[in-house]
């Protein structure tokens, strides 16, 4: 935990005994309904868990209590927060990255149990049942067809995994069918090293499109709803293994940003509101495995928070809009 404004570090948890690998992805979510944000995360070779925030008086003073989310899901690469069943409470979407372990080649959404402090496991609902092969990476969640129910998309990187290199989403069937398997819709195949995908009305036509990156390959693109025609945003950036979408310049349309860990460039893509992007290089000596949009300094504009990869750092980029 890094506490603003001086970013003093507090260690809130050390890796579980026997847990292998690194914590690749995480979310903040109020699990226990006490009004503060808890933390949900994963070890790349183990099961998802959450850390109970002890409250504002002691959150920065030591360890948080760890509790399990699921005892079978293994090799998690992404965890997202969103209300999937429209009950007014956030759920978590988690993929099973390991094809031969846990619920291999599947993606689930998990609802918070009635008593999360004592539950052995959350309520798991497998919507992508064995049809998320190929090294599924990062999910995006949005209502693509305007029916009030959120779809879930993912990119699959391919090698060394079989049957990858695609972007797809799963159609949320809504109501009583939301807890079962959903229909998979392929957006595009032959997308070498596909990873990140997020919803955004890119061209301002009122339809929600998908914005995506080939995080183990080259390029950032967007898919136009409803034909899913591919439009290039950046054809040169290498390994854009992070993606964030927001109105960074506050002009009423959605922009995007990424960092290519091979290119070592942090890029901001300025949208003109019609799906045409101007490319801005914010840094040319930085790597990334994840990039988030946050108002880091509380000045009312959106900054960028970057978790470095080979650069082994955590940095943020101040939006000059409100300077």
For the regions a protein language model found, what residue spans apply to each?
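Beta-propeller-forming repeat regions
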Residues: 1-323
């Amino acid at each position: 935990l890094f506490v603003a404004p001086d970013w003093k570090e507090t260690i809130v948890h050390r890796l579980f005994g026997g847990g292998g690998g690194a914590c690749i992805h995480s979310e903040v979510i109020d699990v226990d309904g006490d009004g503060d944000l808890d933390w949900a995360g994963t070890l790349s070779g183990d099961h998802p868990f959450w850390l109970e925030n002890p409250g504002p008086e002691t959150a920065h003073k030591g360890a948080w209590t760890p509790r399990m989310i699921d005892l079978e899901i293994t090799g998690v690469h992404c965890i997202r927060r969103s209300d999937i069943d429209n009950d007014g409470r956030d759920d978590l979407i988690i993929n099973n990255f390991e094809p031969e372990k846990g619920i291999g080649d599947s993606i689930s959404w998990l609802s918070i149990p009635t008593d999360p402090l004592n539950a052995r496991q959350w309520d798991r609902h497998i919507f992508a049942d064995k049809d998320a092969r190929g090294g599924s990476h990062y999910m995006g969640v949005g209502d693509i067809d305007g029916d009030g129910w959120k779809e879930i998309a993912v990119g699959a990187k391919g090698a060394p995994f079989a049957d990858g290199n695609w972007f797809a989403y799963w159609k949320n069937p809504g109501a009583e069918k939301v807890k079962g398997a959903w229909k998979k819709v392929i957006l595009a195949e032959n997308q070498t090293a596909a990873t990140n995908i997020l919803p955004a009305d890119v061209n301002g036509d009122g339809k929600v499109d998908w914005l995506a990156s080939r995080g183990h390959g080259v390029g950032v693109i967007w898919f136009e709803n409803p034909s899913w025609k591919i439009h290039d945003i950046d054809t040169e950036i290498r390994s854009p293994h992070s993606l964030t979408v927001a109105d960074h310049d506050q002009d009423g349309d959605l922009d995007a940003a990424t960092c290519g860990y091979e290119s070592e460039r942090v890029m901001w893509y300025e949208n003109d509101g019609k799906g045409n992007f101007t490319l801005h290089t914010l840094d040319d000596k930085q790597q990334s495995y994840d990039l988030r949009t946050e108002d880091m300094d509380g000045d009312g504009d959106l900054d960028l928070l970057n978790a470095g990869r080979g650069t082994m750092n955590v940095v943020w980029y101040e939006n000059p809009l409100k300077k």
